[in-house]
Amino acid sequence: MRKRQQSQNEGTQAVSQAPGNQRPNNTCCFCWCCCCSCSCLTVRNEERGDSSGRSPHTTKMESIQVLEECQNPTADEVLSWSQNFDKMMKTPAGRNLFREFLRTEYSEENLLFWLACEDLKKEQNKKAVEEKARMIYEDYISILSPKEVSLDSRVREVINRSLLDPSPHMYEDAQLQIYTLMHRDSFPRFLNSQIYKAFVESTTSCTSES
């Protein structure tokens, strides 16, 4: 009986020490993850979204709007964002981090809409302009869309008239209105968020270590 118990204990220890049961170390750095496709923040926010019971809505344009490729910003650059919203919005790393914050507030569609408008303004092909303009309307302007952005009636009327002959700049008024909303409403909370503070800390530590 004693030998049988001893052999069972040894078998249990062997299973618990097997390589397949060991948890791999997560070596993904916070400051790297903001700019790469394996964003830790994205994973964490998706987990929070699943646990909250809120079903995510994926739109046509959002499927295109993945995190932008960018270089890791310096600590000085990250700190400068707190003084200048325009400067942050001009950098891919800044937009990526701001987008992660907006996702926690369920207002990511504001930035996605702004990015889609920026993309439309670069388009020169008439058919492509018409297609992108229609997709933007369906995803962010239509009252039937789960990603509808908040616009006043005047701007909506301008957009509806422009749909008859779409142009690359047809959403400029709406884009400015959403940009102003993000600047005045979301940006102050972003600067006080744990997402921004942790990113500042991580970039500062990365700079000091190098």
From Swiss-Prot:
Residues with the Phosphotyrosine modification? Y137
A single Gene Ontology MF term assigned here is: GTPase activator activity
Which InterPro entries would you find in this protein's record?
A: RGS, RGS_sf, RGS_subdomain_2
The protein's location, in the record's own words, is: Membrane; Synapse, Synaptosome; Nucleus; Cytoplasm
Q: In which tissues is it expressed?
A: Detected in brain (at protein level). Highly expressed in the hypothalamus, periaqueductal gray matter, and pons-medulla. Lower levels in the thalamus, cortex and spinal cord. Weak expression in the striatum and cerebellum.
What cellular component GO annotations does this protein have?
cytoplasm; membrane; neuron projection; nucleus; synapse
Name this polypeptide is given = Regulator of G-protein signaling 17
